[in-house]
Amino acid sequence: MAYLRSSFVFFLLAFVTYTYAATFEVRNNCPYTVWAASTPIGGGRRLDRGQTWVINAPRGTKMARIWGRTNCNFDGDGRGSCQTGDCGGVLQCTGWGKPPNTLAEYALDQFSNLDFWDISLVDGFNIPMTFAPTNPSGGKCHAIHCTANINGECPGSLRVPGGCNNPCTTFGGQQYCCTQGPCGPTDLSRFFKQRCPDAYSYPQDDPTSTFTCPSGSTNYRVVFCPNGVTSPNFPLEMPSSDEEAK
């Protein structure tokens, strides 16, 4: 009987290890509430200052993203809206958020048994962010940051309430969105790259913006406002909300 119990425990631990390739710890250090979102797994969670949300991601998860929503109001059924990052007016996101929103993107257990991950500003910027492996292994497996005052310095043509749009979102077309083949940086995409060199500033900004870690042995942490401060042009106080059962 003891052998059976030991075998069952071993099987259970092996199953959990096999099922989940990585854990993502999402923390809000902003001096305001952030409604974190995660797709295709996780959904959404209200995070007041100092709160953390843990997401377990299965092997093979790809085209995944984590972002923060701001200035949200949800009712008891989880329906409402957000000023930035809104995902169809629901607390539990199943689709991508509406720009502008700073993105932590990842794909697990891909080529050569590597996780691929990045911070992207292709959908614009709303909240400062750090994205980091909790156990960095050197090379391209290290913390990356986008903590500049982008909202405060945003060009007038890209400025919107609560954030700063990417030129692809604002203007569209080949020049900014690379819709019909290769394209390069523009003056507007360089605005983002100069302030956040780790992050994607336009869709084909891969060489300096894609990071990798060994799959299955790396967990990650996403922190909103890692410095504990926010851009001057962003409101420090958000409207109260009655939504969400945590």
Swiss-Prot record:
The keyword Hydrolase applies. GO terms for biological process: antifungal innate immune response; defense response; defense response to fungus; killing of cells of another organism; response to ethylene; response to jasmonic acid; response to virus. InterPro entries: Osmotin/thaumatin-like_sf, Thaumatin, Thaumatin_CS. It is found in: Vacuole. The keyword Hydrolase applies. It holds the Pfam family Thaumatin. Induction: By viroid infection (tomato planta macho virus TPMV). Triggered by ethylene. Accumulates in response to jasmonic acid (JA) and acibenzolar-S-methyl (ASM) treatments. Its main location: other. This is Osmotin-like protein TPM-1.
